[in-house]
């Protein structure tokens, strides 16, 4: 059986490794638009800051593919999928497939405003992007967008010695991950480390002759030589779309719980798909590494004839910003607008935690400066275990002896958060 995989990122590699794990004889062919082995996109800010050398970004070397008998076509983009004859087409020719996995990922979005084509505008999505930033030798930098990538980029550039301004259109830092109190603590961490943070501010244009010289917002003009755009991504679905594969209402490739697309023998996983939110059962775009890897495993197992269903995606953000652990799992309060929920929170100027509960289930967690219990909270959210059930087992020594994990969960919940 020949398996063809489009994409050499986290999802593509997880799919290839899963196929090889269960089938030593399978023929695996991957197409990579980049010329690099798999690397950690999460570590790109650490390369910018100088915390790690460039070589430490890479999770594999070229020989690793050979050792696992994975044939990879470097620097080749698939331009067409012939679903009738079951073949993919590149500028160098065509390749037949028995099963096809699309893991085409996503690309950074830059808004269509004046000045974004000037030298000095960058995104942070690939090794090549960061190579170009470092080669540019930035000094005065504006980072536009304060999501997790924007915050990490701002920190990395400040550590590198740049004067950094971080701009957010909405009213607080990391608004999709943190409610107001956690965000306020993060704001303080950033500003205490010489990052200028501007919220409720809209970028209107970038000015300069050939090179970035100034960024203009609705409130001010900011002198700068570099603009880093971290305002979101767009799914790479054009190839799938023109091949007759259905696209979901949120813009990702539509798949079922087995990662099957609308075309027979074609699967998709990772950033390019529209998956299901574990907590709501509704379509969601979840552009996070753990979800991409699990989706890829599910796609590969179903390709191999091993029926497996994807449980659903959970939003998980774990960042260390200036040595302070910042974590967001599941829903924020804003996401639950219109539903019944309860919030339990505590904190001071150094740490903060917030648990969001709805219908007896923990559906959200936010913490700043706290590391204990995060694995327990994640497990409770992913398994949708009712708090009442944890307490029932935890209080019964005979039951808890049979399910020791409930002891850990109960100790954490009912000792740390007595009001639950």
What positions do the PLM features span?
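Beta1-alpha1 glycine-rich phosphate/pyrophosphate-binding loop at the start
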Residues: 1-71, 156-177, 376
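FAD-binding core/adjacent interface of flavoenzyme oxidoreductases
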Residues: 1-4, 58-144, 214-221, 228-230, ...
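Residue-level detector of alpha-helix initiation sites
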Residues: 9-13, 35, 106-108, 128, ...
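Rossmann-like dinucleotide-binding cores of NAD(P)H-dependent redox enzymes
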Residues: 58, 140-142, 149-205, 288-292, ...
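Short loop/edge segments at beta-strand edges and connector loops
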Residues: 74-76, 82-83, 125, 168, ...
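FAD-site-proximal beta/loop scaffold in flavoenzymes
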Residues: 117-138, 208-214, 218-298, 393-394
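C-terminal auxiliary extensions adjacent to catalytic cores
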Residues: 346-410
């Amino acid at each position: 059986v020949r398996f063809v995989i489009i994409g050499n990122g986290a999802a593509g590699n997880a799919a290839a490794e899963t196929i090889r794990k269960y089938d030593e004889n399978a023929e695996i062919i991957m197409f990579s638009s980049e010329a690099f082995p798999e690397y950690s996109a999460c570590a790109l800010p650490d390369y910018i800051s100088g915390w790690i050398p460039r070589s430490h970004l890479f999770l594999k070397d070229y020989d690793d593919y050979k050792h696992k008998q994975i044939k990879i076509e470097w620097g080749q983009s698939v331009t067409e999928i012939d679903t009738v004859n079951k073949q993919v087409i590149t500028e160098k020719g065509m390749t037949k497939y028995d099963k096809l996995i699309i893991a085409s990922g996503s690309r950074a979005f830059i808004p269509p405003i004046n000045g974004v084509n000037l030298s000095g505008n960058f995104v942070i999505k690939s090794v090549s992007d960061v190579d170009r930033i470092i080669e540019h030798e930035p000094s005065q930098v504006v980072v536009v967008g304060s999501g997790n990538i924007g915050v990490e980029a701002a920190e990395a550039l400040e550590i590198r010695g740049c004067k950094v301004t971080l701009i957010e259109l909405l009213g607080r830092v990391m608004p999709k991950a943190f409610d107001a109190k956690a965000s306020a603590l993060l704001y303080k961490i950033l500003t205490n480390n010489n990052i200028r943070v501007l919220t409720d501010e809209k970028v209107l244009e970038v000015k300069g002759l050939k090179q970035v010289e100034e960024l203009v917002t609705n409130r001010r003009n900011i002198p700068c030589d570099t603009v880093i755009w971290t305002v979101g991504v767009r799914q790479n679905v054009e190839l799938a779309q023109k091949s007759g594969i259905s696209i979901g209402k949120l813009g990702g490739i539509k798949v079922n719980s087995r990662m099957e697309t609308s075309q027979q023998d074609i699967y998709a996983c990772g950033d390019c798909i529209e998956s299901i939110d574990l907590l709501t059962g509704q379509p969601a775009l979840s552009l996070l590494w753990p979800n991409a890897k699990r989706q890829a495993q599910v796609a590969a197992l179903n390709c191999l004839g091993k029926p497996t269903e994807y449980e659903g995606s959970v939003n998980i953000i774990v960042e260390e910003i200036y040595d302070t652990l910042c974590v967001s799992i599941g829903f924020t309060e804003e996401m639950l607008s219109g539903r019944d929920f309860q919030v339990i929170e505590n904190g001071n100027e150094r740490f903060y935690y917030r648990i969001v509960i709805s219908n007896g289930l923990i559906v959200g967690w936010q913490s700043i400066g706290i590391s204990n219990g995060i694995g327990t909270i994640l497990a409770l959210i992913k398994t949708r275990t009712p708090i009442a059930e944890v307490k029932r087992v935890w209080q019964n020594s005979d039951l808890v002896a049979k399910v020791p994990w409930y002891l850990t969960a109960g100790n954490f919940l009912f000792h740390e958060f007595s009001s639950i």
